[in-house]
Amino acid sequence: MTGVPWWRGHRGEWWVVGQGVLIAALALAPAVWTWAGPSRGLWRALGGVLIAAGVTLASTGIVQIGRDNLTALPHPPARATLIQTGIYARVRHPMYGGLIVAALGWALWKTSGLHLILAAALTAYLYAKAGYEESFLAARFPEYQAYRTRTKQLLPWIL
């Protein structure tokens, strides 16, 4: 602990607050600009599959990163090590990627245009947060640049 209040945000605390606000908005927003009709069941099924895939990706990231590395903050903990195995051999930020996939799934489940907009906003936000986090990781771990060139940032094989 440095004695600096959390609200000064020197470790990226405000990034976590913003992420929480977007996730809460996505979870609690009413379904607006909905598309219904005979295909609604298909959209909900696809949404359910994406939610399950996103939760699986994020959960795998949480388990494999280990307790010493786990933090919601962009700044890595003092005891952190660079994990490059398991899911981290394919994607650098599987927890963010999982949130993105689950958010899209939730929007499809809700069949709501507002939820699609919020999922897109969360995607852009997590992409920016990952970039901010990577500046700390590159400064901390000399091998991070090589790791960055051989792995995707958020979604395996895609982004």
Sequence positions of predicted segments:
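Conserved SAM-binding loop
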Residues: 91-92
